[in-house]
Amino acid sequence: MTQISRRKALGAAAATAGVLAPTIVRAQQTTRLKIQTAVPSSSIYFDLLKRFGERVDKMSGGHLKLEMLPDGAVVNAFEILDAVDKGVVDGGYAWTHYWSGKNTASGLLSNPAAGAGTGLDQLSHVAWLFQGGGYALYKKLYAEAMKVNVEPILLQPMGPDPLGWFKSPINSLDDMKKLKYRSPPGLVGEIFKEMGINAVAMPGGEIVPAAQRGVLDAAEWIGPADDMALGFHTVFKHYYLQGLHQSTDVGEVLFNKTAWNKLTPELKAIVETAAMASMTDTYTYNVYRNAAAVQKLKTDFKVEIHDTPKDIFPAFIKATNVIYDREAQKNALFKEILESQRAFAKVVVPYWTKINGLYYNMGLASPNAV
């Protein structure tokens, strides 16, 4: 190699190193984000969130770490969106219906009551999100309707939620009307009130203490495993499994948009992929853990498991349609989302109901039928 060629080669190598060096430095940096959750550390969903964070950590080679904070560590559950928007915390975890006070359309995305009155179950609701245009409407809620500095990502389908826990058994809707009942916030609470039920909202960690003080007669939270972890069985001995109020219930992680935009495209893709993995993780986790929890509640804690009184179902669906149709007249985004769900349901529900009938009848015919 000539002297000139050697100088050119060395110059090219130096130039290449100069271009690559900043990339290498960035790749070696570790970003740490604190995520304020709406669940206590005893919740199984807190554990699932930590598993989500562990996936992000491993997939990023340790360059992105998400620290999960239990409910109330920095702000309480209903303040999470504002805290993420303002950068008080880097991210948050809750459900979209927690922000119903900002826009009622939020409830249609995480937990449309009675499948938005369309017959959509949890899996078909998630199918609407990913195959029916629902995810774009989800993003539109935050970016255009609420105009918050937030990047939202769905990650935990945890329903269907039971009607809930009762101190005394009920046999009808009239019995339930006599009780003070903890329900989710937003339009679901309005639906219960339309039915004549005295419904109040409060964070999950406050429910058992309120029941112990006699403030509540009945309550719903999430499901058998998580509710047992929070000690519901210590104050309630009657559990009603079928609940229309959250026939689906999808959690979300919210990132402060400024913090999110500082992540590389690769790190953003890792978070989004880990969130999709968390979907499967939550589905499979719930099937077994909730079934095992019901057995334990019956055998170890003498909780009586009941079917929900039949007259609650038509009353709930009727009240849902009243509240939703009324809200659609006032809120353009609510109307857009509801119409999208109804159009999707017309295609999916006839087929999916028949398929679900297979599994229902197969279960009844099995030696494990109850």
Name every feature range the model reports, one short phrase each.
Residues T2-H125, A145-V370:
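N-terminal secretory/targeting leader peptides
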Residues L120-Y138:
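A gly/proline- and charged-residue-enriched helix-loop-helix capping module
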Residues Y142:
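Extracellular C-type lectin-like domains
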